[in-house]
Amino acid sequence: MIFSKAISTIFHPIFAPFVSVLLTCCVVQKTIIVDSCKIPNILISVFIVTIVVPLLATLYMLKKKYVASFEMKEKKERVYALRVNSLLIGLGYLFTNKIYFCQYNKDLSTLLKLEFLAVIFSVYIASEISKHYKISLHLIGFGGVCAVIMRLTSLAGDLLWLLCIFILLSGVVASARRYAGAHTRKQIYFGFFLGFVIQFLFFYL
């Protein structure tokens, strides 16, 4: 049980958007002419918007007892927290897009915008689904990251090795969530499928 909780914490879905952007920036630096000195600014802003702000919001909700724990086991807690965070990430996107994304290479800017919009949409859809059905947020995150890696193959060529690593990690996290009794298989599969499809489809909009 301790191991499964550790895995769930280390691979918390809050980190998924940042990981996607980090992978994108690493690949883009090698394939597109872009000022590498500006990459840290992007990563710092995304880290703040997708990790620091939602974390602070969750801590505030814990303090005000809108949620009982970080696990958010109750349906109402998950819906409320997801809606708040989708709004905060959306506002963060508007700020980041205006200050950073629009200043950079068009190809990189487009990729980052689509990833952000897909994340916002995924979180919002997850909040709506959570009204009626519990879904694995961890696997939504992993599904999204895997979709980003597949998308990046059009720029960097064969990234099969990286995709295999994240699919393997998805399996580890899924097993940990199952062992902890947090989700059924259907909830896990549905989460991965939803995260993957939303992120993948946004690229082709």
Where are the model-predicted features located?
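Membrane-water interface of transmembrane alpha-helices
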Residues: 52-65
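The first (N-terminal) embedded transmembrane alpha-helix
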Residues: 8-28
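Core segments of transmembrane alpha-helices
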Residues: 84-97, 141-146, 194-195
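Short, Lys/Arg-rich, polar N-terminal cytosolic tail immediately upstream
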Residues: 1-4
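Membrane-embedded catalytic cores of phosphoryl/pyrophosphoryl-handling enzymes
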Residues: 106, 112-205
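Juxtamembrane helix-capping/reentrant segments at transmembrane boundaries
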Residues: 69-85
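Membrane-interface helix termini and inter-helical loops of multi-pass transporters
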Residues: 29-38, 67-71, 99-108
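Alpha-helical transmembrane segments
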Residues: 38-53, 118
